[in-house]
Design a protein with these regions (language model features):
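Transmembrane signal-anchor hairpin modules in multi-pass inner-membrane enzymes, especially those
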Residues: 1-82, 92-94, 107-123, 127, ...
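Short aromatic-rich membrane-water interface segments that cap or initiate transmembrane helices
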Residues: 31-34, 88-100, 158-172, 285, ...
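Alpha-helical transmembrane segments of multi-pass inner-membrane proteins
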Residues: 9-23, 42-55, 77, 81-86, ...
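Loop-to-helix entry and N-terminal half of a specific, functionally important transmembrane alpha helix
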Residues: 16-20, 204, 330-334, 362-386
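Membrane-interface catalytic loops of GT-C/OST-like multi-pass glycosylation enzymes that act
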Residues: 32-36, 92-97, 166-169, 215-219, ...
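Interfacial juxtamembrane loops and adjacent helix segments
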Residues: 148-161, 275-279, 290-294, 302-342
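Transmembrane alpha-helices of multi-pass inner-membrane enzymes
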Residues: 45-48, 228, 369-423
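Flexible juxtamembrane loops connecting transmembrane helices in multi-pass membrane enzymes
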Residues: 227-228, 250-293, 327, 447-460
């Protein structure tokens, strides 16, 4: 085979196309995580090709390359699948996607180890990572500073934080840190020689640091300033001094760069590090800890976190035991807590064992090299303790697996064993990319149809009927289809169909507690004339989504029911505020007034709220009022 078309070279080419083009794919969507986000589906298409090349290498060489770290990861992955067999895994099917993603990560690590990637191949891969980071960093800055209202990508120009393609600013921040990590790895291996390479490395460091700051993520800021002391001791000994100085200077300039647009913007600062997320995270961890204590051995069952969390949180809130009420929680923003609550002790001990072994393996090297390797993984590891980056972004998971594979290889080396089976790896090398690409491309069609359906009034059912593969968005597809049938049954007074909806939603409510699910059940009960059950469901929804929190079911129900209901809600809201001022109630009132077109009144309420609650900064920055309070010509 020509040296230009070896499997290792093809691996580099596929990865290059992914970083230059594939990962930046844009398609309108309704948000979410995992396969609900179009760019993730495209990343998995390329990932399947990379896995296929690794399996093809096994077939050609008839050898297996592995080390103890790979075996530990494989064993741990098998253990993490076992809770699916627990008797409480009623909703286990909804955990299969994350287990498949985990298994695919182990498979990509295995595939990388099979390929005989030279130092030059690895350096090319690192430069391709820099290219991807540079593209996303510049795109994020364009979003924040240059896009105007009504832009074709749908970016909210009133947002104070950039998100890049990821639709989630914190994920952007973690991704761009890979640019700093890859550049550090390159200068540590003296792989930055030409002027062009220096421009790429230093330019990426500057723009990546800038994008990291404007992502507004506290987690990213902590990771940024923690990774520098972890990387520096090894870089001091291995990197050329002038490159190390340039690397540090460009990072520092990138961190300072966000201040310049503010100075040129008449002192109007963007509140990038705003929000009250700390209290919410503390609440999620506290509730998760209590849930774990109640079911420590077998957990509550894979796929059950969403439903059990909201009921437990509401109970603690009623007792005044928590501060920082959260909503729509499908994940506790801490990976260890997530697996522990759903699966109990086995996943918890497995993850701790896996982390402990990997740290032990890398610290068998010199302490400077070990700290360097730990620093390369630290941003992602930290982010998994505060959010769910691997669910939001497949490319972050893929790059993390790349780094794990390379670090494990450097720390332990590789063993080689004969593997005479030639046909099976070759078959899987073809089947995995084939089925993955077909699945993901039909998934993109699903996202397009569901997004169009929901954005055009949820009335054209032919869009749902035209979906080829609903699996990437199965929950949303089923909800949209059943809601359409509910609305039709309500209009046509089809009692059997209404009862079918209630029967279907019984299971849904145990698994996924959402305001729209409560709303639909209330409508079904009312259509059947079951007013008592409708009222009970309404009261239960108020318990889960109280009036004085960011998401109030009373407000949402009034907003969806119609103008008269919303006006009645505003009267009730004002009466409550006379007795006791509350920021959330003020915000709901202002949003309701904006929906009714009473803008002047909404502005007066905002002014009154700011006077009564001067310490509530969120009252000064209400998104629904921004179009009416922004200075003319501001972006």
């Amino acid at each position: 085979m020509s040296s230009k078309w070896t499997l290792e070279a093809c691996f580099s080419y596929v990865f290059a196309v992914l970083m230059f083009i594939g990962m930046h794919y844009f398609q309108h969507n309704q948000g979410g995580s995992g396969l609900e986000l179009p760019f993730n589906l495209v990343v998995w298409c390329f990932t399947s090709l990379l896995i296929g090349l690794g399996l093809l290498k096994v077939s050609h060489s008839q050898r297996l390359r592995y080390n103890r770290s790979l075996l530990v990861m494989l064993f741990s992955t098998i253990l993490l699948w076992l809770p699916l067999l627990y008797p409480n895994a009623e909703f286990g099917e909804f955990a299969i996607d994350r287990l498949l993603g985990l298994s695919a990560g182990i498979l990509i690590i295995f595939s990388i180890m099979q390929l005989e990637l030279s130092r030059q191949h690895w350096h090319h891969i690192l430069y391709f990572i820099l290219a991807g980071v540079l593209i996303e960093s510049i795109y994020a800055l364009v979003q924040l500073y240059l896009l105007t209202q009504g832009n074709w990508v749908g970016f909210n120009v009133n947002a104070t934080r950039a998100a890049g393609i990821f639709q989630q600013p914190n994920v952007l921040g973690t991704f761009v840190l890979f640019g700093l990590l890859a550049s550090a790895w390159l200068i540590s291996e003296k792989a930055v020689r030409s002027k062009l390479q220096q421009i790429i490395v230093f330019g990426c460091c500057f723009f990546a640091a800038w994008a990291a700051i404007v992502s507004g993520s506290r987690t990213v800021l902590i990771a940024l300033f923690a990774l520098l002391p972890l990387l520096f001791p090894y870089l001091k000994n291995s990197a050329e001094p002038h490159l190390l100085r340039g690397w540090l200077i460009c990072i520092a300039l990138g961190c300072l760069a966000p201040a310049l647009p503010e100075l040129l913007n008449d002192g109007v600062a963007r509140d990038a590090i705003g929000g009250e997320t700390t209290a919410y995270r503390v609440t999620m961890l506290k509730v998760s800890w209590e849930l774990f204590k109640q079911q420590p051995f077998m957990g509550w069952g894979y796929g059950a976190y969403d439903g059990i969390y909201h009921n437990a949180q509401a109970a603690f809130n009623a007792q005044g035991l928590i501060k920082g009420y959260h909503f729509n929680v499908a994940h506790p923003h801490n990976e260890i807590a997530y697996w522990a609550v759903e699966g109990g002790l086995l996943p918890l001990l497995t993850l701790l064992f896996l982390a402990g072994y990997f740290i032990y393996s890398i610290f068998k090297q010199t302490w400077t090299k070990a700290c360097f390797h730990l620093g390369l993984l630290f941003p992602c590891l930290l982010h998994t303790m505060t959010e769910l980056p691997f669910y939001h972004s497949a490319i972050v998971w893929l790059l993390f697996c790349f780094f794990v594979s390379k670090i494990a290889t450097e720390a332990e080396g590789l063993c080689t064993k004969p593997f005479p089976a030639k046909f099976a790896p070759k078959v899987f090398a073809g089947l995995i990319p084939l089925f993955t690409i077909l699945f993901m491309l039909t998934g993109l069609q699903t996202i397009h149809h569901i997004s169009t359906f929901e954005r055009t009034g949820s009335s054209d059912v032919s869009l749902l009927e035209g979906i080829i593969n609903p699996l990437p968005m199965l929950s949303r597809y089923e909800f949209d289809a059943m809601t359409f049938r509910l609305n039709a049954a309500s209009k046509l007074h089809l009692s059997d169909e209404l009862k079918n909806y209630l029967s279907w939603s019984d299971s849904l409510m145990r698994r996924k507690t959402r305001t729209e699910n409560y709303y639909n059940r209330i409508q079904a009960f009312k259509a059947l004339g079951l007013t008592k059950q409708a009222e009970q469901t309404y009261q239960q929804a108020l318990f889960i989504y109280p009036d004085t929190e960011r998401v109030s079911f009373r407000y949402i129900f009034a907003m969806r029911t119609g103008e008269k209901a919303l006006q009645a809600y505003l009267i009730w809201n004002k009466q409550q505020l006379k007795d006791k001022p509350d920021a959330a109630l003020y915000i709901h009132q202002i949003n309701g007034l904006v929906l009714l077109g009473r803008i002047d009144e909404a502005l007066r309420v905002q002014q009154q709220a700011s006077q009564r609650l001067p310490n509530e900064l969120k009252l000064r920055n209400i998104p629904s009022l921004k179009p009416y309070t922004e200075p003319m010509g501001s972006s």
